[in-house]
From Swiss-Prot:
Homododecamerizes. Interacts with terminase subunits TRM1 and TRM3. Belongs to the herpesviridae portal protein family. Its main location: virion. GO terms for cellular component: host cell cytoplasm; host cell nucleus; virion component. The keyword Nucleotidyltransferase does not apply. It holds the Pfam family Herpes_UL6. InterPro entries: Herpes_Portal (IPR002660). This is Portal protein. Residues 577-613 are annotated as: Disordered. One of its GO terms (biological process) is chromosome organization. HAMAP family: HSV_PORTL.
Length: 613
């Protein structure tokens, strides 16, 4: 993924004491966070406003427009005006009765035409520059600042294709307009020179991707070095990181948010795992129980014993006694057992006529005193032995399963066992699935194939029984943590870069804009250090949010051209110059062409020489 392509001479210069700064697992994760890979929340959308190059585009537009329109002289404007006036007088002979209105109309037409011509010339060519593809990326610059606080920059030569575009731009800028040749030519020439500088600067510097750069720290010289495609490049360290015991901690917003972001991400991952595990809602607690163990013993005796086995008969007696809960039921069971057993005995008292207990009475007494106790001890001993064998069986089964899983994992898809290749391929595919973004079936298969997950939900052993069952749907709450992370993102970006929120009447934030501090912190280093645009003046926070049309109007009002035109208007038609918009006469009001009171009180001045016929 990464181009660790430092040549041998460069690596020898680094020495063994160089500390890797980027790429490392920590630095790569910072860029992946900016790309939305881990816990992308609503507060991170402010970062999209931060990396928007619109403010830089307005700065370039303001610089080009202001520089071009200010590159004109009073003599050029006066020459163009005299030329225009002479042409008008040839076509429209003046009349003394309406000379004042004629001068006003003539000057208003010329000043408005001049403004529209200059505006069209500048905006058309500046738009071509702003919307053309440039090598320098403001978005990558913001990514490097927010992730590491350092910006690598690569110098590259201007291509021949770009030279051809600059040459064609000269033909468009340096043009001739009827009546405004000298002024428009001066403005167009300066626009071409300024545009050429901007285009060459924006296309001679390149900010590479974070996957293409290697950055290391040299403790001996206390400097950071960057390498791109095997050669050393410039590295602007705006916010130096902290290095302790070989660990690099960047001084950046994402580094400060790193811990909270991954806490939220792991919580979301935990919630997803719980959701997958609880897809089957019925869960059971399985344990060992001995209540029905006698059934296995009876089945064993039934298969292996003789037809009339004393052990079987006595065990049946004990089973029937345990199943009866009443005294009458126990009495009936004992009487039935004695009756069956006494039929096979010879009663010597009855045979020889001896007095005393009968055989049935003696048998009953013997059963109640001796036989039951002996058989109970024997059966308990057998039960203990069976339990031990069951535990030993389960232990060996677990060992066998563990050995099978290890063998299957070691063989893999290309192993010698063809029967295990298909399951191994399925397991490998399931293991590559992302739990958060992968399909539910693949994620569940991945969890069930994990050797550390005990996901059995059935009674597998002969000596196991369900102790309790319940419906489990627990999912860790993550909404509060996501909300906290959103607020933390907003607070970090607002306070680090001094952004200004724009809200509506209800207090809801619509968007954020650059403040004067944001321009100094973020746009200043990009303009003067990275792009090396030293003639460009930083845009003000007012222009950072205005539209292009509004910026044009503001720049034209404060330009030299507007001041020169206003001065010509005062000299040529002094009665109507006051109240005009920098020499451009406003439309008359609904009250008519009446003069204001302060104009009536002043004595009328003579027109300047050369004004009129």
């Amino acid at each position: 993924m990464f181009n660790m392509n430092v040549d041998e001479s460069a690596s020898g210069a680094l020495g063994s004491s160089a500390i890797p700064v980027h790429p490392t697992p920590a630095s790569v994760r910072l860029f992946e966070i900016l790309q939305g890979k881990y816990a992308y929340v609503q507060g991170q959308t402010i970062y999209a406003n931060l990396r928007n190059p619109g403010v830089f585009s307005r700065q370039v537009f303001t610089h080009l427009f202001k520089r071009a329109i200010s590159h004109c002289t009073y003599d050029d404007v006066l020459h163009d005006w005299n030329k225009f006036e002479a042409c008008i007088q040839k076509r429209w002979p003046s009349d003394d009765s309406c000379a004042s209105r004629f001068r006003e109309s003539t000057f208003e037409s010329w000043s408005t035409t001049m403004k529209l011509t200059v505006r069209d010339l500048l905006t058309t060519n500046i738009y071509r520059v702003l919307h053309s593809r440039s090598v320098l990326s403001y978005e990558r610059y913001v990514d490097w600042i927010c992730a590491t606080g350092m910006v690598p920059a690569v110098k590259k030569p201007i291509t021949q294709e770009l030279h051809s575009k600059i040459k064609s731009l000269r033909d468009r800028c340096v043009c001739r307009e009827l009546g405004h040749e000298r002024t428009i030519r001066s403005i167009g020439t300066e626009l071409y020179e300024a545009t050429k500088e901007i285009i060459e600067s924006l296309n001679s510097t390149f900010i590479p991707q974070f996957t293409e750069v290697t950055i290391e720290y040299l403790p001996r010289s206390d400097e950071y070095v960057a390498y791109y495609c095997g050669r050393r490049i410039r590295l602007h360290v705006l916010f130096p990181p902290a290095i302790f015991a070989g660990t690099v901690t960047f001084d950046s917003p994402v580094q400060r948010l790193y811990q909270n972001i991954f806490m939220c991400y792991r919580t979301l991952e935990h919630a997803k795992i719980c959701q997958l595990l609880n897809t089957a809602p019925l869960k059971a607690i399985v344990g060992h129980g001995g209540r029905d163990m006698y059934k296995d013993i009876l089945a064993h005796l039934e298969q292996n014993s003789q037809r009339k086995d004393p052990k079987k008969e006595l065990l049946n007696l004990l089973v029937k006694l345990s199943e009866n809960k009443t005294i009458s039921g126990v009495t009936d069971v004992v009487e039935e057992f004695i009756t069956d057993a006494s039929n096979n005995l010879v009663d010597r008292n009855r045979l020889f006529g001896q007095p005393g207990e009968t055989a049935a009475q003696g048998l009953k007494k013997k059963v109640s005193n001796t036989v039951v106790k002996c058989l109970t001890d024997q059966i308990n001993e057998q039960f203990d032995q069976i339990n031990g064998l069951e535990k030993e069986r389960e232990l060996y089964l677990k060992k066998i399963r563990s050995m099978e899983s290890q063998l299957q994992a070691s063989l893999g898809p290309g192993g010698n066992n063809p029967a295990a290749s298909a399951p191994a391929a399925v397991a490998a595919e399931a293991a590559s699935v992302d739990i958060l973004t992968g399909s539910t079936a693949s994620a569940i298969e991945k969890l069930f194939n994990s050797p550390s997950a005990s996901l059995g939900a059935r009674v597998s052993g002969h000596n196991e029984s369900i102790l309790n069952s319940f419906v489990s749907q627990y999912i860790p709450p993550s909404r509060e943590m996501t909300k906290d992370l959103t607020e933390l993102w907003e607070s970090e970006l607002f306070n680090t870069f001094k952004l200004t929120p724009v809200v509506d009447n209800q207090g809801q934030r619509l968007y954020v804009r650059y403040s004067s501090d944001t321009i100094s912190i973020l746009l200043g280093p990009f303009t003067y250090l990275v792009a090396e645009l030293s003639p460009v003046e930083l845009v003000t926070d007012v222009y950072a949010t205005l539209g292009i049309v509004e910026i044009i109007d503001e720049l034209y009002r404060s330009s030299r051209l507007a001041i020169y035109i206003e001065d010509l208007g005062r000299k040529y038609c002094p009665a109507s110059a006051t109240g005009g918009d920098h020499g451009i006469r406003q439309a008359p009001s609904a009250r008519g062409d009446t003069e204001p009171d302060h104009a009536k009180s002043k004595p009328a001045r003579d027109p300047p020489p050369g004004a009129g016929s």
